[in-house]
């Protein structure tokens, strides 16, 4: 995991080179998809486009830092099972017991490592496009609600879980 000077974890999810065909030949451009998190529950993603790779990465990282959201975590995993959807992409995320690790691939793994989840089971269904999988993962994570928040919404007292 690559950490910057602010203690944020930066992960490059996808780097793409695109070509625009012009009269004189091909003009290349780059796009970068980056996930940034503090490994304590905050995570954001950004897409940057530029003529050079470092500039695309810088733009993506800046956008990711600007759009960070807080995710409620419970003992290094998710509080409950969720389904995130975006476009054709659907990501299923399940909490896992301690010691399981991050069982996920590609974009989902990058998000989980950046957010600070240590144990999770995930499956991406419908598409393997990194953009859509990443957005579906983020849609699922942002829909998570903590037990305290739900009890406050319902006007009830939070009780200890039954064993």
From Swiss-Prot:
InterPro entries: Ribosomal_Su5_D2-typ_SF, Ribosomal_uS5, Ribosomal_uS5_bac-type, Ribosomal_uS5_C, Ribosomal_uS5_N, Ribosomal_uS5_N_CS, Ribsml_uS5_D2-typ_fold_subgr. Keywords: Ribonucleoprotein, Ribosomal protein, RNA-binding, rRNA-binding. PROSITE patterns: RIBOSOMAL_S5 (PS00585), S5_DSRBD (PS50881). The keyword Hydrolase does not apply. GO terms for biological process: translation. GO terms for cellular component: small ribosomal subunit. The N-terminal domain interacts with the head of the 30S subunit; the C-terminal domain interacts with the body and contacts protein S4. The interaction surface between S4 and S5 is involved in control of translational fidelity. Belongs to the universal ribosomal protein uS5 family. With S4 and S12 plays an important role in translational accuracy. Located at the back of the 30S subunit body where it stabilizes the conformation of the head with respect to the body. Part of the 30S ribosomal subunit. Contacts proteins S4 and S8. This is Small ribosomal subunit protein uS5. It comes from Nitratidesulfovibrio vulgaris (strain DSM 19637 / Miyazaki F). The gene is rpsE.
């Amino acid at each position: 995991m690559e950490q910057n000077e602010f203690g944020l974890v930066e992960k490059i999810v996808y780097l793409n080179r695109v070509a625009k065909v012009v009269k004189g030949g091909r003009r290349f451009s780059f796009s970068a998809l980056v996930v940034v998190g503090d490994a304590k529950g905050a995570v954001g993603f950004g897409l940057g486009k530029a003529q050079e790779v470092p500039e695309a990465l810088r733009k993506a990282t800046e956008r990711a830092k600007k759009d960070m959201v807080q995710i409620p975590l419970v003992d290094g995993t998710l509080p409950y099972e969720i389904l995130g959807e975006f476009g054709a992409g659907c990501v299923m995320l399940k909490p896992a017991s301690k010691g399981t690790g991050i069982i996920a691939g590609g974009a989902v793994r990058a998000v989980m490592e950046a957010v600070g989840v240590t144990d999770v089971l995930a499956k991406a269904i419908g598409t393997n496009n990194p953009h859509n999988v990443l957005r579906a993962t983020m849609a699922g994570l942002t829909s998570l609600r903590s037990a305290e928040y739900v009890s406050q919404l319902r006007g009830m007292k939070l009780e200890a879980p039954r064993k």
